[in-house]
Structure formats: C-alpha cells, structure tokens
C-alpha cells in the first residue's frame, strides 16, 4: 500500500455511492432509483437493467471480475457466492461481460445449508437474496482480486426472514412511521423520514500469528481455554490510550485505508484497557448501513492482521483475567432535515418533545428489559457481562445529573421548572483554556447510557452483528411512541395531555434509572428490590424471545412472525450448545494430547533429577516436593478430564434444543472450569520449556 495518501481523495472510491450514480446513470433512471430509496417505490426491470449495466462497467473499471450478493444469514457472519461477469462464449470463442437487472435485484443461494430453526427442511433448498438499494454496493479488493459486493437481504421461498437485515429494515420502517406520528403532534409537517443512526465501536485483540497457530484453543474457539495470568496484566492502566506500537500503527494505517476506500468512516483508534487490546470507532450512519459497515470492519481487521503476521481476535473473552471485548452501540433518531430527536437542547426541562421521546425510551427499556438483554446474548458474552469489566447483566439507564434532576422534578412535583447549569471546568491552571462541562459524566458500568444526544447500549458482544440489538431498540421504542401517540392524538387539550403523559411515564418507569456503580453488590440487591431482571446467561435470556408479549410486539409492527421468532430461539439454543461442545472437545483434545503428555514427560525428568541429586549425597527435598505437587495436580487434571469427557458425551447425545443447551450450561461448562483450574496451576510451576503452548505473557506482550 502507498506510504502517504490524502483521505479525501481515496474516501469512497470503491463505493457505487450517490455521487457515482448521479454521474453515471441517466437522469430519469437516477430519479427513479432515488424515489425507490426514499419512498420505497418499486423498480421496474428495464430501469434495473440500466443500473446493473452501469454498476458492472464501473466495477470492471475498478478491476472487478466477479460479483456477489453479500448477505448476513443467522450464522453471525456474512455469506457470499461469487459469479463472474462473463457470459457464454460467442462463435468466435470470445466472451462478453454482462450483468442484468434481474441478477442485481435477486439471487438464489441454497437456503438449506444455513441455520433456519426449522423454517426450512434440508430438502427445501430454495432461498432468495434481494438487493438492499439503501446500502451502497462496493468493490472489495483482496487476495481473490476485486469483487463487486451487493448488500442484500436473505429470505426463504415462502418469505420468512433467514437473515439479520430483513427484520432490521422492517424495524426501521416501524420506528420511522411512529416517529413521524410523534413529531407531527408537535407541528413538524416537513420531515418525511426519521432514521435510526448507529455508530458501533469495535474492540479487538491482536496476537502474533505464529503463536496463535500454536494454540488449538484459539484456532478452534477464538479464546484461550487454558492459561495462567502473567506477572503483569492490566493493573497499571498503562496500555489504555498508550502510545501505539509501530507494528500496530502500521496495521491500523492499512485498515483505515481499506475501510475509507469502501466508504466506512473509520474515525477513532486507540489502545484499550487490556494488553494487546485495541478499538476502532466509526462516525454514525443509517442503521442498516452501519450494520453492513461493522461487518466490513470485522472482516477487514482479520484480513489485514493476517497480512501483518498477526491474528485479530474478536471473541468476547479471549483471555481470562483481563478485560474482554464488546461493541458500544450508539443509537439516536434523526429526521431527513438533520434534526436529532435525542438532542435535549440547552434547557431540556422546556423541551417537551425531547422529554416525551426520553420518557418513551425509558418506558420501552423498562418494559422490555429482558428482550433487550437477550439481544446481546452470546456464549462469549456470558464471560463479560457482570464481570466488573463490562456492564452488568441487569438492564438500567444512566441519564446523567442534569436529566436525572429533570426527571426527579417531574416525579416529585409533577412538573420540571429548571435544568441544572453545567458550568465551566476549573483546572486551576491559568494557561489552560476554559472548558464547558458536559451535561453528564460517563458511567462505564451502565449498560444503557445517555451521552449528550444519543443512547449507548454497551452490552453487545464484539463478534456479534449489531443488527439484533438495533432491531429490538427500534421496535420497542416504536411501540412506546405508538402508545403515546394513541393517547395524544385523541386528546382535547394536547398541552395538558402531553405533560400528564410525560409525568406518568417518568413516574412509572423511574425504577429503570440508575446513575450509580453497576459493578457493586449493592446494586444487585437494589435491582432485585426494584424488580429488575438479572439474567446472567444466554440460556436464561433466550426465553424472552418467544414470550407472548414479545411475539405480539413484533407481529404488531411486522418485524417478526411467530414462526420467525421461534426459529431464532431454536437457532440460539443450538448455537450455544455447539459453541460449548466445541470448547469442551477442544479442552479434551488439548489436555489428552498436549498437556498431560507434556507433564508426564516433565515428571519423568524431574524424577531422574531427584534420583541424581540423592545419588550425589544431597537431600533432594525441594525437587521431591515439586514432583509431588505436580503429580497431585496431574491426578486432578486426569480426574477432571474424565468428568468432562463423560458430561460432554451425555450432552452430545441429547436432542437439540433448550434442554440440551441448559445441560451444556449447567454441567459441561462447570466441568470445563474444573479442568482448567489444575492445568493453570501446573503452568505456574512447570518449566516454561516443557509447557506445550505459548503462555499469556507470550501472547499479550509479544506482538
């Protein structure tokens, strides 16, 4: 890659964006496409043919030889099938490059090989991908050459959603319709659309590729299943925001260049809290585009890391004892006029529309806390949530001092008469500039926090698509808006009705507001007293997806059908069971083939040393004590290994579903922890040269 470049010159150069379409498409075709994007109008095949031709010509100019419908099935990662632009050879033996409107609009991958949760039988293979024209096509360049990637939705032959994008787009329509209803009540007749804006911050680890390949657990599961803590971890806080090392800086430069060319607004990069941990954050985009971009970010991080002799770990908890990784899903609502509905203004107590929006969101989060928690449920996330490094598993809302004061006024007196003045920041140094204080501090222990003009949902796992959480957020807030509008549209005295409703929602849902330390034991007790759910694991979270309340909610806004929700719950149970099964089998393999043989070999050497020392006429007490300690731990390891084998076999023999997932959680996972304990103790006392894999110190500090 080039050493120096101008970001403005390269940004979006590989994106078939609005400017490119306006330049290349005939005026009428461009106008029809914009109408389809903005108003949801249908596109006729003749117009699609013109768009496809120009898209193909543009992509070929970029070096593309293939195109793919780029979609997001329920595997958690993107999927793609590549077709070249060549047509059947002519009589001369030459080929033409072609791409039709039909090929642009619709693809037909095999749906039977993707998770469907019973929606599709193995013999029912037909599935469709449909062009999402609101997310621009782009050319991706990698070792395979250049490929035209067309973002698409994925559905079954009978129309059920088999992906993340379809319900996300449905939820965006729901929040748009209900937001427009709400702002119309306040006299805004100009806005035609309200869009959820999303900015997902991405955390990740980087390790040396050679060391990665010496760890079966990292290869098969993405996290270390064994590993003792090194003498130093993250306790000095010296890695967070520290100077970025040259190898990492070179990697970040190449990541940024690739992302900028594909139109991803990579904005912020820094070292995170744990050693070898880093973060990348983009500028906000429309929810569906932001979801697509986050998938591109994860793919690009992994690809560029390999090119730099490293591996990017996106698992939520790749290393025990140091922080794991997540995504902060920043969410707001913006009109097509650029108005942010979550902007409180200078005097939020006077901003009635904002207060209604705010209290509706509190109502939504309080009433659907379990569903919001479920949207972040993942086997890896079970290691993070509630572990004093990430938000607790209890959903609460942090508002900050100013907004909490406004809410307290509403709850206690029935009206808000003032907003706290944030004032200036006093540094005590005359040469430093005077700084205005923000309206709220940051609370990193809160799962759902207001940060000035947006909410930040901090529970999402680092590997997960942010689609799931945004589907839930959009839908539950749309429902709260809908209920509020149902009341206010019938009111004879709108001003009184809206004030009464704001007070009602603030009072009824004030229990969800918590500005304190979410890591404390006191909060767990207080949350229980308030009646807030504390859902600690993925298997305990999944049932919220298929309650009658949830089904009614999603069916009301045509986001999910009952069958789609039931299928997703089934898939999640299966995914949990499969993930833990792979981890358990990997531990069994590593313990049986690497760790126990290495320890036996080492004890043999140690026993020889004991005998040699004794023969030399010296008391071998130290060596003998060490040999005894290792032998005891080796016995515990073998005993724990046998237990893990037994419960893993029992779990694998069970019928797939909730019962099997719970058995993996209740029996297999604890058995894995029991096997890890003696192995990690052994690593602390066995000669490093005898240990069969790189240590935490090697992985975290040698990259």
Regions flagged by a language model, labelled:
Residues 10-125:
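Active-site core of metal-dependent hydrolases
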Residues 125-314, 323-326, 333-570:
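Glycine-rich, acidic/polar active-site loops that bind/position phosphate-bearing ligands
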Residues 1-8:
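Short, compositionally biased "basic patch" segments
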Residues 60, 64, 68-72, 293-307, ...:
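Hydrophobic/aromatic-rich, well-ordered segments within soluble, folded domains that form packed cores
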Residues 47, 71, 100, 282, ...:
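Active-site proximal loops enriched in glycine and acidic residues that flank catalytic Cys/His/Asp
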Residues 507-703:
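C-terminal amphipathic alpha-helical interaction region
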Residues 76-92, 109-112, 117, 215, ...:
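Short linear, low-complexity motifs centered on an aromatic residue
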Residues 219, 294, 316-317, 343-347, ...:
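Composition- and surface-driven signal marking solvent-exposed, interaction-prone regions
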């Amino acid at each position: 890659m080039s050493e120096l470049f101008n970001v403005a010159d390269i940004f979006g150069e590989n994106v078939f964006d609005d400017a490119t379409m306006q330049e290349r498409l005939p005026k009428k075709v461009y106008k029809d496409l914009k109408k389809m994007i903005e108003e949801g109008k249908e596109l006729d095949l003749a117009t699609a043919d013109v768009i496809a031709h120009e898209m193909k010509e543009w992509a070929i100019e970029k070096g593309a030889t293939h195109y793919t419908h780029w979609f997001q099935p329920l595997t958690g990662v993107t999927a793609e099938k590549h077709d070249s632009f060549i047509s059947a050879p002519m009589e001369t033996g030459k080929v033409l490059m072609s791409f039709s409107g039909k090929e642009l609009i619709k693809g037909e991958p095999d749906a039977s090989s993707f998770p469907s949760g019973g929606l599709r039988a193995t013999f029912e293979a037909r599935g469709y991908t449909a062009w999402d024209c609101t997310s621009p096509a782009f050319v991706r360049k990698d070792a395979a050459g250049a490929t035209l990637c067309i973002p698409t939705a994925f559905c079954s032959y009978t129309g059920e959603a088999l992906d993340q994008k379809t319900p996300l787009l449905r939820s965006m329509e729901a929040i748009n319709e209900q937001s427009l209803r709400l702002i119309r009540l306040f006299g805004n007749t100009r806005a035609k659309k309200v869009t959820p804006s999303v900015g997902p911050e991405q955390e990740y680890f980087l390790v040396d590729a050679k060391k990665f390949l010496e760890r079966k657990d990292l290869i098969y599961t993405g996290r270390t299943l064994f590993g003792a803590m090194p003498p130093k971890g993250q306790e000095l806080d010296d890695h967070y925001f520290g100077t970025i090392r040259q190898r990492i800086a070179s990697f970040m430069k190449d990541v940024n260049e690739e992302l900028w060319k594909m139109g991803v607004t990579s904005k912020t990069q820094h070292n995170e809290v744990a050693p070898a941990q880093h973060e990348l954050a983009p500028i906000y985009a429309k929810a569906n585009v932001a979801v697509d971009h986050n998938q591109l970010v994860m793919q690009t991080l992994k690809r560029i890391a390999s090119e730099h002799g490293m591996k990017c770990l996106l698992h939520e908890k790749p290393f025990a004892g140091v922080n794991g990784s997540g995504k902060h899903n920043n969410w707001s609502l913006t009109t097509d006029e650029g108005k942010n509905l979550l902007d409180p203004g200078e005097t939020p107590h006077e901003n009635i529309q904002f207060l209604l929006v705010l209290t509706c969101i509190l109502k939504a989060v309080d009433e659907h806390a379990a569903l919001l928690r479920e949207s972040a449920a993942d086997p890896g996330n079970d290691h993070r949530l509630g572990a004093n490094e990430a938000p607790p598993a209890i959903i609460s809302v942090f508002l900050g001092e100013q907004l909490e004061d406004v809410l307290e006024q509403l709850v206690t007196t029935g009206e808000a008469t003032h907003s706290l003045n944030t004032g200036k920041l006093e540094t005590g140094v005359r040469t430093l500039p005077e700084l205005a204080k923000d309206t709220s501090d940051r609370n990193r222990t809160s799962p759902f926090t207001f940060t000035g003009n947006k909410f930040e949902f901090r529970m999402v796992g680092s590997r997960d698509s942010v689609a799931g959480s945004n589907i839930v957020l959009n839908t539950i807030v749309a429902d709260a808006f809908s209920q509020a509008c149902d009341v206010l549209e019938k009111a004879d005295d709108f001003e009184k009705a809206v004030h009464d409703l704001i007070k009602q929602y603030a009072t009824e849902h004030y229990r969800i507001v918590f500005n304190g330390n979410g890591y404390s034991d006191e909060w767990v007790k207080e949350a229980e007293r308030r009646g807030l759910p504390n859902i600690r694991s993925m298997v305990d979270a999944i049932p919220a997806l298929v309650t009658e309340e949830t089904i009614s909610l999603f069916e009301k806004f045509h986001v999910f059908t009952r069958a789609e929700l039931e299928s997703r719950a089934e898939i999640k149970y299966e995914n949990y069971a499969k993930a833990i099964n792979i981890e358990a089998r990997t531990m069994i393999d590593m313990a049986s083939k690497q760790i126990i043989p290495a320890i036996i070999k080492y004890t043999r050497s140690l026993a020889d040393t004991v005998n040699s020392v004794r023969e030399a006429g010296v008391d071998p007490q130290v060596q003998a004590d060490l040999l005894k300690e290792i032998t005891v731990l080796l016995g515990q390891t073998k005993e724990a290994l046998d237990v893990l084998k037994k419960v893993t076999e029992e779990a694998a023999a069970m019928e797939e579903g909730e019962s099997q997932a719970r058995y993996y959680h209740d029996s297999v996972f604890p058995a894995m922890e029991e096997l890890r304990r003696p192995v990690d103790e052994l690593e602390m006392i066995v000669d490093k040269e005898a240990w069969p894999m790189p240590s935490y110190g090697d992985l975290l500090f040698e990259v």
